[in-house]
Amino acid sequence: NFRGDRAQEISLAFDGDESFDKFDRVKVPNVKFAGMLQYDADLQIPKNYLTEPPKIKNTLTEELCKHGIREYAISETQKYGHVTYFWNGNRSEKFDETLETYVEVPSDVVPFDQRPWMKAAEITDQLCEAIESGKYDFIRTNYPNGDMVGHTGSLQATIIGVESVDLALARVIES
């Protein structure tokens, strides 16, 4: 169940500098850390790795930018990397700053089953605004509710999370 974002987090814990603040490391272990591959070439995470990651070329965003197509991507923190970094072929930087607009809606720091609607309404507010503005030719989003709440194992919370996405999508369709 490998996830590149989790591998980046543990890599930074081992070979990040003193500014690392994701959790209290107590002390930095004196080890030579190497990941299986480099999870983020732009940010050089990790600094040492065993195999070269594949180069992903001609992503959809890259092609859209070549053709001057304006795009908009939005999600909350839990899935922001999926509509940006992973979508762009494991690339942190934008292909064209003038054509790409990325919006991260900060996730709440509470267990997902306690707030299963997450930020669906906030995402939808901004998504509908982007649609109605007419400024974008290509728009993508990721509502994380089904995935993140589903992992809690609470069926009732998951149902609420998915229903909140249903309500949000009804608003998007109206836009």
List each model region and its residues.
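Feature captures the catalytic ectodomains and active-site-proximal regions of enzymes
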Residues: N1-S175
